[in-house]
């Protein structure tokens, strides 16, 4: 019931990832296994798409699809996936009982299952609707651990063999279900290293551990994710290295003389540590992703703004840890102390039977779990599992000690009558010794202990009223509160996504911050530029750059990308003052994420934000696309303590805004507001959870200059463009040869359709104008653009603005902008072409009839491709190393001359 509290707000999937997992499971059921394995999802990461099988949690989709076939019972898949995590959370509590029972006995197992059922970190990531990787991954991972430890403990070698194979199998499936399960690699590695010191049956270990490790690696490598990189990388080495050490240690101990065994063992241990560090430091092993490295080293968080921006990657604070684990930490600490105190006094005095190696494993997983949870908030559930194991064993030890019973024996009375050494008949009836059991510490102390324990367990579940273990796990499904900070339930997102599904063309592409990608794809049925898989940080940085760019620049970038709509989400509070509706912004929408946009895009936040790092500056409101998309205008600023108002921002003041639609649907701006969600259209006071959808105006005419497209002054005489069809006349015999470090690019001119443009290019080339310039704008799959004289010596912020000092008229034709065609770049006006040109490295029909095609690459296409693959700054599309994209010389040759003087192979061999 605790896990199902979110259903009070509405029966929906929760968070973001579950919507993709639902869509993927539906695809698997509808199209079958073969189609799923080869599924390239074109609705995500437009235009590249996504290989689902290699980038998602495959076992989650297969498990859900398999169980739905069996237990679906006529329910919809959507409803089934909502209940799925609650069911597996309950099943995992049973696995936890079995796991801890193996380590600490039945009492410890019962305590563990109880703690697991009410632990806030476990519940938060396993509530109803949480159809994500954690619940199933933790189930498989803990099941694998249980079978592994149970196999080591089993006296029957055949049963042990089966359990070890099962343990490796399910642990590997856990790895593939949720990457967080790989946390278990650390305690497993340390445990395997410790085993030869605490287990004497070395013959068993010699085959048991290698068997378990081999199965784990084989199954893990069989999945596309984690895949073979797991086996051959640092993570696989975390199992292979300790296994090699264990085998070596056993042989060293076996063949060493009694007096040298310890010395040799320590030498092997030290040498293994040095060798392991050397191997990992050499970078010969495949390194895990940044997230895994960040989990090991929390100081890396600030080095990646995208990782740092995700709430679940934040480092938990002391208050949060104390709220979650205070009582459990108390039991865990006391339990550890009692276990080691008893073992130091007398091996046989432990009140419960715990084998040496099980004690060691509990201690290792507890310490490592506490460390892991201190790095990532998302790993709190692993910390909770580790602390629960220690606390349960500790509480079992304490309880056994307190409630231990002492048996007293009462001797029979001997009759004084009769001969010596004999008893009377009556006394014979009492010769049997009487026994009486009492609590070792007395009845009162035992009852008091029970009361105290019950109180310690109950207090966190009822106090404080709004911050106890039960209340903190109750929150609305994210789709109903938009992921905001408010415990509200609105239909803003559902009705917006339904509107998108029914009112936009099916092939529409929607740009938004990546948080909303899965919702738009699944409930809106539309393609997005990025989503919650965060597969390409460069694309996410580019989206952030778009939001912070000028409206004209953002329009150009969106237009070039092929987007049709832009979505933005804003949260705030509406109130009425003197008959006017006013707003205070903040609460978890894009208005609260904008500072992360700036960090991810590499922008200086001081230009956009006031000194509180939240309140937008006038520049933000007037000069950024995001500021224009937010339908608000500053009215005043006030001090929340003194209620003093100011027309301008003062430190510590809060902004107050009025509603202003800056891009109305009937306007001629770069965007048109085509839909806004209900709470934005309400005139009642309260929380707003507003979703706005803007159409990108395809007919918009740029009004400002652009740094990526040349923007020379337009001649005072407006020249009307004409469209020319290619004639049967042969084009000029001249060709242009562009020399680069990768080889030559040979361009065949088309003066049959663009004679003035060809003549202009030849004139500039012959004068040396292009020599030393670079391809300053490189967009993979789109264009490489060059011809700006500013790239010879000007600063990067001037690249794309230079020209020849004059302009030429357009010469549109029916030629198509397909790969390797050469066309003239221009500014906002169609009459503004001058010197800059671009070579297509992909098809772009949206450019046809708008830009002048004047040539085609007939040789050196491989050189074009190499330049198109140069590493660029995602925020500007400029090459990181300009020399990679430099045109050393551009010459004009007749085709006959070129064929005799140009090298046979125009690409370089270097």
Regions found by a protein language model. Give the residues of each.
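Membrane-interface helix-loop-helix junctions at transmembrane boundaries of multi-pass membrane enzymes
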Residues: 158-159, 201-207, 258-266, 330-364
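Membrane-embedded helix bundles of polyisoprenyl
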Residues: 1, 36-44, 83-102, 107-155, ...
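Cyclophilin-like peptidyl-prolyl cis-trans isomerases
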Residues: 710-910
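Extracytoplasmic
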Residues: 91-94, 410-716, 721
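Transmembrane signal-anchor helices characteristic of membrane glycosylation enzymes that use polyprenol
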Residues: 1-18, 23-26, 30-36, 40, ...
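Hydrophobic/aromatic-rich transmembrane helices and adjacent perimembrane loops
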Residues: 363, 367-368, 372-406, 451
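Membrane-interface coil-to-helix junctions
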Residues: 1-91, 119, 132
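Alpha-helical transmembrane segments at the extracellular/periplasmic loop-to-helix junctions
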Residues: 235-252, 265-345, 358-359
